């Protein structure tokens, strides 16, 4: 719950808990007990997790048109259920790659967030808002070291060991709709870093005999620059609005195509998430006109999504950094008369692109 005093001070405490009706993986050296005793010897019941999450927010007016706002809070996030329950039968092969087991005893991920900002009216119905933020995430889910299994082989499980943080600022300029015009623009600069974006990345590094990562690298969702804007024009019976966005590309890990590098001094590879995908730009337009048809209230509308029909590339080939082509295609035949289908069908990835231009035109009638 939360309480406020004269809309200036807000505080609250949240009590969170997770109670998993499940058991933890068996002991690392599991002997073959009779089925009736196996659960008692080889498994243990998971204990519930509890956390108290304090939060506080303060808004202090410095003029009749300006205010400083500060907030601090703890946030509790239950791990993805696949990390808790993956491989629920605890089936492990007798080799050195027994796979990953879910860990129902994972602790919730804990994020501590700090914000400080300033909001000021700069003109009639127009204001700016600058907010600086920092988010620190502990108990980020990672992968354990290899656990030996009796009599041979090993496996790994998910555990709370990694770390991530996000920091940056957001600047907003907003004008309320008045006099037939309104709009706003917001810009965010952000850095999101951590040891691993996904526990699977740590698992594959371990399979390649790489040491656990200790340095911070850009996370998969690290989007350095984000610019959004909107405008609205309107009259008595009509309105036209636009929504646009310009985002810098998220990171990806580049790689050479197979066979390019060889020899004892071969290049070991690029750092994870060391390059960026192409930037994203999108513009949508919406227009509507109200009228009366046969005594009924009607509204004609036209919505155009991706007005400029830009092919935004959200996923890319790692050897080129583009969705449109890969160097792999240069070394193989793209077609084979003796086969159904060909490589071209694999190289064409429409799911890697954003939606093309789409136009919706219609009418709404109210009785």
Where in this protein do the model-derived segments appear?
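Signature of Gram-negative outer-membrane beta-barrel scaffolds
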Residues: 1-63, 83
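Gram-negative outer-membrane beta-barrel transporters
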Residues: 5-6, 133-136, 141, 148, ...
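Outer-membrane beta-barrel translocator domains and adjoining extracellular loop/strand segments
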Residues: 9-16, 52, 81-87, 94, ...
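Residues that define the transmembrane beta-barrel architecture of outer-membrane proteins
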Residues: 48-52, 110-114, 165-167, 223-227, ...
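Residues on the lipid-exposed face of transmembrane beta-strands in outer-membrane beta-barrel proteins
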Residues: 56-60, 116-120, 171-175, 185, ...
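Membrane-embedded beta-barrel scaffold of Gram-negative outer-membrane proteins
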Residues: 61, 67-73, 79, 83, ...
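Repeated loop/turn-to-beta-strand initiation elements of outer-membrane beta-barrel proteins
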Residues: 65-68, 125-128, 180-183, 237-240, ...
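C-terminal beta-signal and adjacent terminal beta-strands/loops
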Residues: 138, 191, 244-264, 278-282, ...
């Amino acid at each position: 719950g939360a309480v406020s005093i004269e809309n200036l001070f807000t505080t609250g405490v949240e009590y969170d808990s997770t109670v998993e009706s499940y058991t933890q993986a068996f002991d690392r050296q599991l002997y073959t007990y009779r089925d009736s005793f196996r659960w008692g010897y080889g498994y243990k019941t998971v204990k519930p997790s509890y956390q108290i999450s304090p939060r506080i927010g303060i808004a202090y007016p410095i003029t009749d048109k300006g205010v400083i706002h500060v907030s601090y809070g703890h946030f509790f996030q239950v791990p993805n259920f696949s990390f808790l329950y993956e491989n629920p039968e605890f089936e492990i092969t007798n080799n050195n790659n027994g796979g990953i087991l879910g860990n129902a005893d994972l602790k919730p991920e804990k994020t501590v967030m700090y914000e400080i900002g300033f909001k000021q009216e700069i003109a009639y119905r127009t204001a700016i808002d600058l907010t600086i933020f920092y988010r620190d995430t502990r108990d980020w889910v990672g992968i354990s070291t290899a656990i030996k299994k009796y009599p041979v082989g090993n496996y790994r499980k998910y555990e709370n060991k990694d770390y991530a943080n996000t920091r940056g600022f957001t600047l907003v300029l907003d004008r309320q709709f008045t006099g037939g015009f309104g709009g706003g623009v917001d810009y965010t600069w952000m850095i999101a870093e951590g040891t691993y974006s996904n526990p699977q990345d740590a698992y594959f590094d371990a399979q390649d005999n790489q040491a656990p990562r200790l340095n911070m690298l850009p996370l998969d969702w690290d989007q350095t620059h984000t610019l959004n804007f909107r405008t609205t024009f309107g009259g008595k019976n009509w309105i036209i609005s636009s929504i646009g966005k310009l985002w810098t590309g998220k990171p990806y890990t580049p790689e050479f195509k197979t066979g390019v590098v060889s020899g004892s001094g071969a290049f070991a590879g690029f750092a994870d998430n060391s390059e960026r995908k192409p930037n994203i730009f999108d513009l949508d337009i919406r227009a509507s006109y109200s009228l009366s048809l046969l005594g009924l209230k009607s509204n004609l509308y036209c919505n155009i999504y991706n007005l400029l029909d830009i092919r935004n590339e959200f996923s890319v080939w790692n050897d080129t950094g583009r969705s449109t082509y890969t160097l792999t295609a240069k070394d193989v035949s793209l077609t084979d008369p003796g086969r159904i289908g060909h490589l071209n069908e694999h190289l064409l990835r429409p799911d890697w692109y954003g939606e093309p231009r789409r136009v919706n035109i219609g009418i709404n009638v109210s009785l």
